[in-house]
Curated annotation (Swiss-Prot):
Protein name: Tryptophan synthase beta chain
Residue numbers bearing the N6-(pyridoxal phosphate)lysine modification: K99
Cofactors (names): pyridoxal 5'-phosphate
NCBIfam families for this protein: trpB
Cross-referenced PANTHER family: TRYPTOPHAN SYNTHASE, TRYPTOPHAN SYNTHASE-RELATED
Organism (species): Corynebacterium glutamicum (strain ATCC 13032 / DSM 20300 / JCM 1318 / BCRC 11384 / CCUG 27702 / LMG 3730 / NBRC 12168 / NCIMB 10025 / NRRL B-2784 / 534)
Domain of life (superkingdom): Bacteria
Length: 417
């Protein structure tokens, strides 16, 4: 099976974001992608579909999610500036993370297409959990591919998926992480697409997946924009979200992209440091290439081979990134920065200690950047409003954090009061 770009025919929606995106897939998958794109366009133009989706978002997922202003952080120093940090609470979505937003959309779409089986991949287990609960709700078979390493470090989510009736398949090949789970899911879909829908969990993959995922997640920024205007009377100065594959971030950025006065920042996993060889900062430190059917930035070695990515957070441990993020970086519309494991762990503890919220380690990367920007603003005499996508809750990470801090006591938060 060879992979080549789909050069035949045209797509209904733009397949590229600048030079990034496309459909670099086996020819046997092109009919499935064409069918999916047509079904998505038809569905989003259907008032009945939009009404049904809106009902699930409201009555099952609990949308709109709240906007919480951090009120107890010990930030104020000697500077004359003042920073306000607001959290868009995607951790309060049913399922525990932003993932369920677009999963409900895709499962409804799959049912509309007559599919009876859903295939998914998962890293931290949040996407797999969201897919499993949506399939349980709508009576569809669910198969989840998960890297063997991730199965080991995310046992609670594995059991949750199984409770919902999903079959979880550990992937031992390669590095045993998210990249390898995606490969196996794509192989399955290639063989079974007549009855199966591949529910991709991030804003990457071949067209039309990046567009579908963005559109179903755009509700995050649509709500947040309205909430910020109501609460503060203006748009935020900075919007920050963590970026692995980039789904929560593109949902958080989407409605702000045309607002040039709003700075967009993606927090990538710098792991043990950008020079350590152990990180997943694809845009900050990667090269352009093709992975999982799309042209974007990748973690690649000097031979051009895709490298293993690394992050303390399983959900950010992906060696590629969505093509729209690559385009936002290339055009300068968004900035992408590396946040280390140590910085994320500090932010995790900070939010728990001072605001009573336990964030996912993924979200902790975004919050760590917000803390840095807030401190700098106050030192430099700036007044700054920062909006953070709190993309998921941290229940799944508590044991991992506890073990890590026991092994590295120097990272335990010192009380700043």
């Amino acid at each position: 099976m060879t992979e080549k770009e789909n050069l035949g025919g045209s797509t209904l929606l733009p397949a590229y974001f600048g030079e990034f995106g496309g459909q670099f897939v086996a020819e046997s998958l092109l009919p499935a992608l064409d069918q999916l794109e047509k079904a998505f366009v038809d569905a989003t133009n259907s008032p009945e579909f939009r009404e049904e989706l809106g009902g699930y978002l409201r009555d099952y997922l609990g949308r709109p999610t709240p906007l919480t202003e951090c009120s107890n952080l010990p930030l104020a120093g000697e500077g004359k500036g003042f920073a306000r940090i607001f959290l868009k609470r995607e951790d309060l979505v049913h399922g525990g993370a932003h993932k369920t937003n677009q999963v409900i959309g895709q499962v409804l779409l799959a049912k509309r297409m007559g599919k009876t089986r859903i295939i998914a991949e998962t890293g931290a287990g949040q996407h797999g959990t969201a897919t499993a609960l949506a399939c349980a709700l709508m009576g569809l078979e669910c198969v989840v591919y998960m890297g063997a390493k991730d199965v080991a470090r995310q046992q609670p989510n594995v059991y949750r998926m199984q409770l919902h009736g999903a079959k979880v398949i550990p992937v031992e090949s390669g590095s045993g992480t998210l990249k390898d789970a995606v490969n196996e899911a794509l192989r399955d879909w290639t063989a079974t697409f007549h009855e199966s829908h591949y529910l991709l969990g991030t804003a990457a993959g071949p067209h039309p997946f990046p567009t579908i995922v963005r559109e179903f997640h755009k509700v995050i920024s649509e709500e947040a924009k309205a909430q910020m205007l109501e609460r503060t009377g203006k748009l935020p100065d900075v919007v920050v979200a963590c970026v692995g594959g980039g789904s929560n971030a593109i949902g958080m950025f989407a409605d702000f992209i045309d607002d040039e006065g709003v700075e967009l920042v993606g927090a990538e996993p710098a792991g043990e440091g950008l020079d350590s060889g152990k990180h997943g900062a694809t845009i900050t430190n990667g090269q352009i290439g093709i992975l999982h059917g799309t042209r974007s930035y990748l973690m690649r070695n000097s031979d051009g081979q895709v490298e293993e990515s690394y992050s303390i957070s399983a959900g950010l441990d992906y060696p590629g990134v969505g093509p729209q993020h690559a385009h936002l970086h290339a055009t300068g519309r968004a900035t992408y920065v590396g946040i280390t494991d140590a910085e994320a762990l500090q932010a995790f503890q900070y939010l728990a200690r001072y605001e009573g919220i336990i964030p996912a380690l993924e979200s902790s990367h975004a919050f760590a950047y917000a803390l840095k920007r807030a401190k700098t603003a106050e030192e430099e005499g700036q007044n700054l409003t920062i909006l953070v996508s709190l993309s998921g809750r941290g229940d799944k990470d508590v044991d991992h954090v506890r073990r890590t801090l026991e092994e590295n006591p120097e990272l335990i938060l010192k009380d700043n009061r």
